[in-house]
Amino acid sequence: MEPTPDHGEQSYRGSGRLSGKKAVITGGDSGIGRAVAIAYAREGADVLISYLNEDEDAQETARWVEEAGQQAVLFPGDLADAATCRAVIDKAVEVFGRVDILVSNAAFQMTHETIEEIPDEEWDRTLAINLSAFFHLTKAALPHMGPGSSIIGSSSVNSDNPVPTLLPYSATKAGIANMTASMAQLLAERGIRANSVAPGPIWTPLIPATMPEEQVESFGQQVPMQRAGQPAELAPVYVLLASDEASYVSGARIAVTGGQPIL
């Protein structure tokens, strides 16, 4: 992938903000997930990296986590299957003993010019991976999360400003924003926080893999900053939301959009 995304490999500096915490990150093999895994490890967290089947990419992320002196656990599997979601959490509990941070970040998208072009199977898969997996992961993790734990959903600017050619994807990202808002209210009495992050155009492998070439070439130019963001520019937000510094932040959605407002 050219240019190579910046995941903070050479730039992110930790300060112990997540020392001793145990994190689960889905879609952690590349893109935003890799950047978050690197940042979490450099802040002192052990990380379970859930991914589909990109073993080489996942091993590269694990190498960065271990280089930071933290434990990396790799778990391949298709999150469209609820049983896989439960197995991810089971593995985290087996190795770590608990879950302090859950980042539901894995996503699937395809572009289509008309509604009729969208295969039923693709609609179902998009909802299963992007939205239903978030539910199944959270439900499985909650018995192993204590006060001070944090749940973070990767939403999108498309939740408020949907791109019509990304209809299924946009619908799921709006769902994630609403799910975290509801979770924040349901889980407050347990001391568990839930928030979402709404990225704008971020340069990840998902972009050239799912978009027409002409859209890839102009990707990010539509926002006020006139460029795509890098995964490394998102990671500090995920660190904040996972840390005790955000102890009164729950039910929020933080936009990282290059100047495109979400109101």
What would you call each of these model-derived segments?
Residues 55, 75-89, 120, 232-233:
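The beta1-alpha1 cofactor-binding region of Rossmann-like NAD(H)/NADP(H)-dependent oxidoreductases
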Residues 156:
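Residue(s) in the substrate-gating loop at a strand-loop-helix junction
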Residues 188, 193, 249-251:
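Short, small/polar-rich loop/turn modules that mediate ligand/substrate recognition or access, typified
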Residues 138, 172, 180:
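Active-site helix of classical SDR
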Residues 1, 6-10, 112, 161, ...:
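Short C-terminal tail/terminal secondary-structure segment
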Residues 118, 162-170, 182:
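Active-site loop-to-helix junction immediately N-terminal to the catalytic Tyr of the SDR YXXXK motif
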